[in-house]
């Protein structure tokens, strides 16, 4: 499940990973 380019939506440190 991806949100803003990351595996956790957009609230994670991997937001754009």
Curated annotation (Swiss-Prot):
Expressed by the skin glands. The modification Pyrrolidone carboxylic acid is found at residue 1. Keywords: Pyrrolidone carboxylic acid, Secreted. GO terms for cellular component: extracellular region. It is found in: Secreted. Its main location: secreted. This is Novel peptide 2. It comes from Pithecopus azureus.
């Amino acid at each position: 499940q991806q949100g803003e380019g990351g595996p956790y939506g957009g609230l994670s440190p991997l937001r754009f990973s």
